């Protein structure tokens, strides 16, 4: 999980969203309207909206509100991780917004899940070096 992720306002431009994602090397941005958490914007949503083949408005005319996902998966920090993973897999979701006491505390992504699973596998099956075989 990435604690205290960068967020974007629903009224910000997609150009600003792209710059923010690029600068911080993230693929998901929680979306807020004022203090309220209202959804998530993914790099996939952004790329699709800015694809010239789709004939959408020029990028400077599009805003986060035009393309973000309003029904983001939001979980409390106490939610068991297996429940979160099952839901993400079943719904083909790339991220879960994590809250604590009703406030955004982090974002858990499919990349985070892969990293954790990789660490777990290495703890179970340590890598062998050529010297271990001899």
Where are these regions (language model features)?
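Tandem CBS (Bateman) regulatory domains
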Residues: 1-4, 42-74, 80-89, 104, ...
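The conserved cystathionine-beta-synthase
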Residues: 7-25, 32-33, 74-92, 98-99, ...
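Short hydrophobic beta-strand motif reused across regulatory alpha/beta modules
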Residues: 27, 32, 40-44, 94, ...
């Amino acid at each position: 999980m990435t604690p205290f992720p960068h967020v974007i306002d629903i009224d910000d431009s997609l150009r600003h969203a792209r710059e923010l994602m690029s600068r911080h090397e993230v693929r998901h941005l929680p979306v807020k309207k004022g203090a309220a958490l209202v959804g998530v914007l993914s790099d996939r949503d952004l790329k699709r909206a800015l694809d010239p083949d789709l004939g959408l408005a020029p990028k400077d005319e599009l805003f986060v509100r035009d393309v973000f996902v309003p029904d983001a998966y939001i979980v409390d920090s106490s939610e068991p991780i297996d429940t979160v993973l099952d839901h993400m897999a079943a719904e083909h979701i790339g991220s879960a917004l994590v809250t604590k006491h009703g406030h955004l505390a982090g974002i858990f992504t499919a990349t985070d899940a892969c990293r954790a699973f990789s660490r777990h596998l290495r703890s179970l099956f340590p890598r062998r070096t050529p010297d271990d075989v001899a």
